[in-house]
Structures are given as C-alpha cells and as structure tokens.
Amino acid sequence: MNELMKIFGQVSGTQSFDQIRISIASPERIRSWSYGEIKKPETINYRTFKPERDGLFCARIFGPIKDYECLCGKYKRMKYRGIICEKCGVEVTLAKVRRERMGHIELASPVAHIWFLKSLPSRIGLLCDMTLKDLERILYFENYVVVEPGLTPLKIRELLTEEQYMRAVDEYGEDAFTAKIGAEAIRDMLTVIDLETEKAQLKVDLKETTSEAKRKKLVKRMKLVEAFMESGSRPEWMILEVIPVIPPELRPLVPLDGGRFATSDLNDLYRRVINRNNRLKRLIELRAPEIIVRNEKRMLQEAVDALFDNGRRGRAITGANKRPLKSLSDMLKGKQGRFRQNLLGKRVDYSGRSVIVVGPELKLHQCGLPKKMALELFKPFVYSKLELYGMATTIKAAKRMVEKERPEVWDILEEVIREHPVMLNRAPTLHRLGIQAFEPVLIEGKAIQLHPLVCTAFNADFDGDQMAVHVPLSLEAQLEARVLMMSTNNILSPANGKPIIVPSQDIVLGIYYITMERDEVPGQVLKIRSMDELKGAIANNAILFYCPTDPNTKIDTKDLDTLLDRLASRNVTAHRRVNPSSKDALEAGLKGGHLRLFNVEKPGVPLVFADVNDAEKAIKDGKAILFKVPVFVNMAEIEEALTEKTITLHTKIRARFDTVDSEGTPVTQIVDTTPGRMMLSVILPKNKNVPFSLINRLLTKKEIQNVIDVVYRHCGQKETVIFADRVMGLGYSNAFKAGISFGKDDLVIPPEKETLVGETEEKAKEYEQQYQDGLITQGEKYNKVVDAWSKCTDDVADAMMKQISSLVPGKQINSIYMMAHSGARGSAAQMKQLAGMRGLMAKPSGEIIETPIISNFKEGLTVLEYFNSTHGARKGLADTALKTANSGYLTRRLVDVAQDAIICEEDCGTTNGLTVSPVIEGGEVIASLAERILGRSAARDIVNPLTGEVIVKAAQMIQETEVELIDAAGIETVVIRSVLTCDSEEGVCGSCYGRDLARGTRVNVGEAVGVIAAQSIGEPGTQLTMRTFHIGGAAQRGAEQSSIEATFDGTVQVINRNVVVNSSGASIVMSRNCEVALLDINNRERARHRVPYGAKLLVDEAQKVTKGTKLAEWDPYTLPIITERAGVAHYVDLTEGLSMREVVDEATGIASKVVVDWKQQPRGADLRPRVTLRDEKGEELLLANGLEARYFMSVDAILSVENNTKVNAGDVLARIPRESSKTRDITGGLPRVAELFEARKPKDHAIISDCDGRVEFGKDYKSKRRILVVPEEGDAIEYLIPKGKHISVQEGDYVRRGDPLMDGNPVPHDILKVLGVEALAQYLINEIQEVYRLQGVKINDKHIEVIVRQMLQKVEITDPGDTTLLVGEQVDRVEFDIENSKAIREQGRPASGTPVLQGITKASLQTHSFISAASFQETTRVLTEAAVSGKVDSLQGLKENVIVGRLIPAGTGAVMNRLRAIAAKRDKDMQVEGESEVPAIPPVAEGSAPEAPPAE
C-alpha cells in the first residue's frame, strides 16, 4: 500500500487546496497567529543595526536575522536547530521565517475597523441601524449613545450630547441607564445583537412594510444578518481589540549608504499606533482626566484608520516628504497594487528583448535569434550539455568557457536550440496572436528577425518596433508552445475565422503585378534568325510592323534598310501574321483559340465574327488580320520564352495546368492565362477543390486571403504553410523585378475637377440666396451646402480614379493605382487627397466646416485652407493618445467579465436558439445569412421548403457545404444554437458555441471562449483608435439618405400604407411604420425599406419596378408635421412671446415663427401649443379615426402656415429641423460600444411601448406630456415624455409592442423587459457590429453573444414562491435554478423572476469569485463585502487560479484538473482500502504532509 503511494506521490499537500475562504478575524484568531506582542515603537538600534527587543523588528518575536544563528551569537549552525537561546530569546532557525511570522498589538481601547465602518454601505451602521454620521459622532467622542435605557424615557440608540448626558444623569441617577461613548459603546451594541431574533423581527417588518424605500433597506439588513449567521462571524469582531502586525520582511527597513535608512511606510504607520497606544495605557494607569484620555483614544482610532486605509477619513497622513503614506489598502489597490502588479502580471526569467528586422528568407515557423541573445537565454542548457560531453568538468568551468565564447560553445548552442521553440511577444498584446512560438535560427547581429507573414498578427512593422523573447523551459511548456502556439498553428484569426497569415505590402504588389493581364499589341513578337528569313517573310506578307509608341500606326515596309535600322533601335515592333492554309484550318484554329482575329485599324481590339465565312471575307478585304496566341506545353517553355522576351509576364497565352481529380489521379487542363499566373499555379497545392480559376484573375490582397482560405479548408495546415511561404517568395522577387515606384506625374488631377467645383460653387451660392430669401433656415442651408460639397468631393475622386485606372495599350499602368487597388499600400481616400480635392474638414467638436478645401496636396493648399486643415489633423493626433487608453480599458473590462466563460461540456442538449436572418440596411445585404450561420449548430432541423428534405439535422454543425445548400434552397431565416440560450450550469457547451474560429473545427472542451471573445472585440477597438490620424482629419460623411431606390427588379408591396394626396398630386405617407418591400418572381421578399413619415411615395402596391427606380423621397433634414384634411389652420396656445416668437434672421431680415420652450415662464405652464383645423364655420374638423384634427408642436418647430389660412390635405404645417449628422469615426464608435456593453441609458433615449395598442394623449403633467397606449383589453399604460422632445406618434396611431414613441436610441433594459432576451441580443449585436462595420472590421457574432451572456447572468425575483429568496433580490441564474429544483423536490411552489441586464463592470464585480472581483476594481469594497459574508472562492475562473498560482482550468489545465480530480479520488479510495486492510497503520504515507485545511 505504502509502496504504491510512493510511486504515485500523494495528490494533496500544502499546494492542493480547493477553495479559499475569507472572513473577519476574531481577536482570539489574531492572537493565535501572533508570535508575540509588540510593545515598543523602536525598529533597530542605529549603532549595532540589531533589531530592538519587543520592537517592530524584534528577533525574539519574528525570528533570527541570519540563518541558524541567534541574535547574541551564542548558538550558531544547523546543529542547534530549534533551540531557543536563553540569553536573547531568539529561536535558532531559518531567517526566512521573518517573512511568515506575525506579531500583534494589544489595544488599550477598542477601535472600529475603518473598512466595515466607511465602506458603503456601512456594515456597522446597517447592523446597528444607525447612520454613518451618528456612528462617527460616537466613535470620535462627540456624542454618547444610550446602550441600555433601563426604566428611563430614553430610547435605545439615542444620541446624547455631553450636556444632555449630564442632565440625564442628574435626573435619573447614574445607575438608571447605561450610555457610552467611543468604540466601546458600539462594541457593546454589537455584542448584544442576537442574530436569530433580529432575523425573525426583520421578516415580520418586511411583511408589514408598504414603502418601497423601507423595504429595500430591510432587505439589505436581512442579507447582512443572514451573511453573519452563515459565516459564523460575530458582529463585534468588526471592532478591533488586537491589531495584527505583518511580518518584518514584508515591510523591510533597508540601510542606504550614508547611514540613512529606506523604510516601508507601514513601519511609520505601525509606529504611530504603538506610540499612541502606549501613551493611552499610561494615561489610563495615571487616571488622567477623561478629556485627555478621550483625545488620546480618538487619536488612536485615527492612527489605526490610517494604517488600514490612509486617506479614507479626513486628511491623509503624510510622511517626511509630504506625500501620503501607503497604507495596507493601498498595497492591494490599483494597477500598482498587489493584485495587478505581482499576482496577475509577473516578470519572468529567461527573457530578452531587441529590435526586430524583416527576415524574408525564414520559413513561417522560424525566427532569427541573435547569437549573443541565444547564448544568454539558453545558458543553463549549454552548461549541462558541456558537462555531459565532458568538455567542462564543473559548472564553473563551463561558465568560464561560455564567458570566453569558445568556438565549441557555439556548436553546443546550435544543438541545444534545435527544435527548442521560443516565444516572441510584441506589446501591446491585444489578442492571443500577440504571443507566438517559433523555432530559433541563430543569426549574426543584434536584431531579432521576424517572418513577414506574421506581422499582421503582431501588428508589427519594422520602423523600430521591439519584441520580447521568452524561453519555455519544461518539457510540457515546450510541448504546448509547439502544439498550440507555433505560428504555423495560428493561420486563422480567432475573431472572424479568416486567415491572418496573409501577405501584405510588397508581397501583395508583386503578386498583383504578375497576375495582371495586358492587351499589349496582340500576337507574338518576332525573333528572326537570319536576314533571308526576314526578307522572305516580308515578301510573303507574313509580317506586320508597328510603331511601339503608338501601336495603331502601321509602318510601311517598302524601304528595307530604314526598316532594319528602326527594328534594331526598337522603334518598330514586328508581329507575325498568320495566313490559314484552308477554311478547315481556320475553323479549327479559331475554335481551339490558337488564333485570334484583330482589327487592322486598331490592332488592340479583338473582333468577333458570327461564322468562319465572315472571318474569311474580312481577311480577304484586309479588314482583319489573324494573330497567333502563343501555346506552351509546360513551365520550362514559358520560362524560356520569358528569357527570350518573346512574351511578357502579362501576355495572353494558353498553357497546361496539372492538377488531380477527386480520386487523386493527375489530370491536365488547358487554360487561357498569362505567364505570371502560370508561375503562381506551380506553387498552388494540387487538389480538386482548388481550381485554376481561383488564381486565374487579378489577385488583390482580399483575393489572396481568399486563396489561402480555400487552400487551408481543402488541403490542410501543412500545405497552407508551404504555400504561404512560397507565395511570399514569389511576391518579393517579382515586386523587386517589377520595380514599381511613382513620381509626381503619377498623381493625375482629373480635368473635370474645375467644372465640378464650379458647379458646386454655383449650387452653394444658390442655397445662400434661398436662405437670404427666407425659403430655408440657416441649418437647412448648412446641411445642403455640406451635402453638395460631399458629393462634389466624391465626384472628383471618382473622376480621378477613372483617369488613373484607365488602361492605355502600350503605356505602363499607373503605379499609385496599382498600389492602392492591390491593397498593398494607400487607399482611395488618400489618393483623393493627393490628386482629387481634400474636401470638407471637421472641427474638433465633430462639426463640419462648410468651406471645403478645394486644392489637393499636389497643387498645394492655400494658407487659409492649410489653417482649416490643421484643425482636424491635430484632433486626430490628440485622439489617438487618449483613445488608446480607453480602448485598453474596454478590453480589460471585457476580459474580466468573460474570463470564466469556458467550454465545459460537449452538448447541453437545449433546443432553444436565436433566429438569424441576413442583415439588410438601406436595401443592401450587409451580412448575408451564409456568413452569419457558418460554423454554428442548428437548433432545429433545417428543411428545404420546396422538397421537404432535411439539409441540416438539429444540433449538427453548419459547414461550408451545408451553407451552399441552404442558400440554394432560398431559406431566409434559420434558428441556430447560441451561447445566450445555452443551458450549461458552469460555462458554455460546445454545441451552442459551434466552430472554433481559429482552428476551423468544432470547439474543444476547455477552450476559454470568453477571453477569446473579449480579445476579438477589444483588439480592433485599439487598432481603430490608432488609425484616425492617417487621413488627417478629412471629414468622412456620406450625404444623408433622402430617397429609396429599388436594388433590383421586382414587384412592390406597401406595408401599413396610409397616404394622402396633396395639392400637387403627390402621395404623402402619413403612417409612422410604412414599409416598402420588393418581391422577386417567386414572391420571396428580397428587400424591405422603412419609409419615413412625410415622404413622397412614388410607387404603388403591386407595381413592377426595375433596378434603380426611385420608390420614395423626402427631405432628410426636417421632420414635417402634415395635415390629413383640408381646412382652415388656427393657432391654439401659440402666443407671441410666450410659446412662439418671430425670429428675424440677421443675415436675411426675414421673419419666421418658431415655437419656443413655453415651460420657462410660469404663465406658460399649462399651454399645449397646437394648430387646429376648422371648417369655414369655425367648427373643429374630425380626422378619419374620429379624433379632432389638432397637431401638437414641439420646441424649435418652424411654422409653415399663417394663422387662419386655408390648407390642403398633405400640406406641411410646420417643420422640425434635425441636427446635421456629425462625422462618424470610431471615436464616436468606441464610446458607443462601451455604452452598449455597460448597458447605460443613452443620453437622449427613446421610450418604447410596452404593448400593442392605440395612442392617446392624456392630460399634461408639469413639464412632461402624458401619452397613453390603450391595448385591446386591459388598462392603458401611460408614459411621461419631456415636452420639448418630438413625439414620433400621433393621436390615434396604432403602435406595436417595442415601437419607439419618440426619437432616439432605445434603452437596452427596456428592450429586454418588453421584447425579451432574443430581441435584446439582436439589438446589441447589430448595434455593436454597426460600429465595427463602419471601419470595415469583421467580428463574428458569437463573440458578442458570449459577452451578452455574461451580462445576463442575474435574475430578479418577482415572486419568491416557497423558496428562501426575497422579492426584488438579484440572484445568479444557476443559484435560481438550484433553489427552484429544491422547492419542487419538496413539493413547493418555485420562484419566478425576470432576467436582468448588467453592464460589464457591474457583472464582473458580482462574480462568484471574490478574488477575481477584488483584482478588477474597488478592491477594498469587494473584500469588505466578502469578509462579512464569509465568502468561499471555489477557484473556478481563470483569474483566481492565476492569482493563487495554479494551472488555469482551461485548455491543457482543464485536462490536468480532470486528471487531478480522478487521482484525488483514487487516493481516497486507496486510503479507505488501506484502512480496511491494515487498521494499525496510520493512513498518512511517509514523507508526505497531512491533509491541509482550506487556506484562510
């Protein structure tokens, strides 16, 4: 039995604890930790440097200074181990016990623990049922408190001032009642509390109380009382009688040179406590006057407060250098505190850092490591090898050899490094690809070489970036580095599943260059071997001569000598003309594509003929010439022709492409291509799913990424890596050969620019004039001008792109265009500024300056324009600095909230899921169904609606093949499994998560999907904020949408149609929720557009439209208020100077009537400004729904009709101007993402309707308007909306549940309450994706779902049923389920609750684990709360395990944990067996520690 134990080793020991409990220490507990009382404030003797006895560094209490040596030197060496010296009282032992032995200070008077007093809500206050102010009055000796009123009329816990106390003593006598002062009073009050009776009383009070505020307070007290009962702590322990003193080595005193000392602030703080405590003892012994004693007690309380949390109360105590002393709390708090500095982030040994340079000759899995660095990093390995081979006898000798850098050392180093991966890391590490493993290759020099393809993942460039190298030491670490972190294993990005090992910059340019196809002059350039041959060919008319500068000019061939000269000097190119021998030969040649017909006038233009006869006739008439298409059998021939220069890389040729079919047998295809693409085809892996058509096109960066993706999916990882490396080689060499560079003439300024700018200037003048004439307001003018210039800038840019991208035969393609189009460098936006016009600039506030910058950088800016442009550019730079921090903080909060979302089982078996459909905006499909469901599991069977066959079974993963089938079947919506609806207790299950995006396979159990999600969302945030300044602040905003066009041919369907025809005969939409849908031939809805109120509807139901037809149009800058009937308009409550004023525009002198905020004045309080329609007799008209025709005005509305004037149906009564949209960059975007994840209320949020029903306006309430929504049955629900806000519904409108009643963003909590979890998820996903989409960043939906799941962990109890839960209490979902199943087991009624949405910060602070929460934010508060309730941390998340120094329960750690659990069980079973067999032997094996209790 024992032998077995020895082999396996026991699993338990000091290290193996399963949980950590935190609770309040009782005075007895503190004394039991202590090794002695500290009585003196002295630290060390300044002459002997020995610690003073009974002082803060006392050797008798804390242990010896030197190993195995007592203080006086009587006992030295190991043999006296454990002896206590009788002279100095020091135990002979290791000096490191000074790191673990504690002392204590016995206080002369009890003091309150500041954490329990001041940490809100004050725990002491809650238990005593007193306010914090009152408590402080008692503690700091201002008031007495009645502890025991006796028979006097005084109340318990009543406060008495000194005079009142004296009066009461006089009146009732000293023994009639007890009143005390200071911490003792509070200790007595806490001691008498009986938790059981208190709880019973609270239950009674809860039942009786009616007020909500009281209930909340009672619930809080109830929770606190229950916490104390559960944890077994006593309330009076919150008042300290003994103070523990931490070990001296943890608050060291270090002698500096020059006889001064550096000391930890804690020593100062402890010294103050001891001094005051001793003085207080002496005063009490001397029976000093009460007032002096009290003052000393107060000072003691303050000293202890400062020790625990300096600065929490009153002014912080400062040291000699005027800065506050660092108290115990400060040691834990913040970035520099214990948690974040030393427990979550540690510095590691065996690491180095250096500048990186590019290493294009490396393989993907290699990195170049400077020899010097490698030798230093791998020293121990080198030493052991030197010893092993007998080159060095001792480690010291080996050390000398290494220091001298003897030649054999380098050979050993090579051997040590072989197959030993190292990890490279570039800060900031924003996602897991910021650390990857490589095999080192030794290089000369001092810089690390990095493979170019991994730069994207590291976000590295070679302008001076530095990287750190780490060496994994143990075999397991090396294994993990190789299997999980090797760069070759990280081809796909975890954020979106697309390859991240993609070529960029030069490589892209090279590949783009060789895949270009150019119609130079058609045909085959000649190489003539002899003069005679040339003469013969000319005579036979088999040759055509062209001038190369202008390939359209034919050269006359009469004068042979000049011709030869010109051929030699390359002024002429000759092309072979083919004369087919017969009609059949011609037909065969044309069919096989070996011949091509060309126009004689323009030899660059191929001709198409209906049949062979036409072709023959054209050739006879000399209208057409045949040219030969070069045909090549293999790559060798192509290479030869390229060296011979008979063809270029871009000539059209036919060639043979070798590949394999599905069985794997080699096949050849004949393809029309170019030599450059053939070069690419050689390195393409042979696979039936990787066709030649994949690369037989112009390859831009996106296309190359796509090629790599396809190769990865079909050929596997190894092939992909080899292919990527080869692509890199090919790209680099060809970029070098192409020699693409640009000069200033490559920036082509389009000739149309002047006319476009001129036209727009005219327009702007015209708007100015309209404004002068009072037809439009200042705001509308601004919007129109800005729009006009936006459009002009885009038009100039388009003209420039057209000019630059046009191909002129015989001329080189524009280099800048090639760079931008290929995605190698630069963008259309940058080119626009270089050669188009810079356009509109934004002010720092985000508004757009309406005078644009007309010049571009090539022309140069005028002084004024330059000044305008500095505005935006400077903002960009300032933003970058500020936003990086914000983004990093967002990532930190996300990681914290999601860290314990780990895949914990294969399948939870739920049938719930989310309904997914394509995202359509403005009629365009932004995210197709295919990309949204790829790699997810189906929640139910997906059936083809036409055939009824099952495409995907429930719980099966949807792969690429299934996606194609679903697309083909025309399915519009699919229900997929989602983490949001996963039923796993801990973490999430594999089925609900679906595909692991970084591997392309189903996710493994133990994958930390939460952290991956957080990184995927946070990483682009930082990227984007760092990129604002590249465009230099140029405003980017599209013109506001002002019309809807059909995106394809189809039939119109108008939903919720409610229109009136106005005086000019146009149909005006009067409905708030009118939509236009387009149906295709099979009556499937292909697009749906919302038509705003007041728009002109240009089509009708069932009308057939073609693509590009306008369906509706409107003015995007104003919200109109429109009449439904003809009549006479009357102003009601529109009083000049009160609710309306004439605004005379200074610029135009034209007056317009504007509704102003009438609530500002007292007499305006009850007004409801409106325009009412009456008939000729003055009777109020009624609308179709039976309500009076009156239209309420909101603040800032501009009236368009005069009082008592006739109006027609569909006329505009008033316009409400909309603010112009600010430019949207991620600066606006990042805070928006944070706002959504924090679940904050948006600034001007919309109120949404809770039910379906009709809208009615109720009586106004103070400054709010009352809107009633009346459902079919049940009571009306009323909403109060501030009067100035524009209400987007009219009286009598029918609204659906969840419809907004006013403008603005809805509040996520409302969506959850009204529409449920799924709608909330859809809303959050769409809103967050919207921000990233604007920046062109792709993030998979599932990452956002993981975070939203973490935000929805809590449930608010609405009905406790027969459980112990309380109404209004927020409990964890899991806890809720456990309680309910318990209730059901006992035949009780289960509780019911509603899901609660929490912001990510709040959610992370409320995790199960107090260690994780404390290390995140508000450390003291979290720890106080945890201690009071005696929380147990079961160490389930990642963070808490990192902090206590164990393997994290994810990835390989999850497997280890499982094995450890099995082993522990085995140990237990074996012990039980052993006990039953041999009862005499004690169960603990030799040499192993007994089971440790849970660590405190």
Swiss-Prot record:
Which residues does the annotation say bind Zn(2+) 2? Answer: C908, C982, C989, C992
Swiss-Prot/TrEMBL catalytic activity: RNA(n) + a ribonucleoside 5'-triphosphate = RNA(n+1) + diphosphate
Which residues make up the binding site for Mg(2+)?
Answer: D461, D463, D465
Its cofactor is: Mg(2+); Zn(2+)
User: Do you know which Gene3D superfamilies this protein is assigned to?
Assistant: 1.10.132.30, 1.10.150.390, 1.10.1790.20, 1.10.40.90, 2.40.40.20, 2.40.50.100, RNA polymerase II, clamp domain, RNA polymerase Rpb1, domain 3
Q: Where is this region: Disordered?
A: 1467-1496
Gene Ontology MF terms: DNA binding; DNA-directed RNA polymerase activity; magnesium ion binding; zinc ion binding
Q: Which UniProt keywords apply?
A: DNA-directed RNA polymerase, Magnesium, Metal-binding, Nucleotidyltransferase, Transcription, Transferase, Zinc
Provide the top EC class: transferase
What is its quaternary makeup?
The RNAP catalytic core consists of 2 alpha, 1 beta, 1 beta' and 1 omega subunit. When a sigma factor is associated with the core the holoenzyme is formed, which can initiate transcription.
State the function annotated in the UniProt record.
DNA-dependent RNA polymerase catalyzes the transcription of DNA into RNA using the four ribonucleoside triphosphates as substrates.
Family of this protein: Belongs to the RNA polymerase beta' chain family.
Q: What is this protein called?
A: DNA-directed RNA polymerase subunit beta'
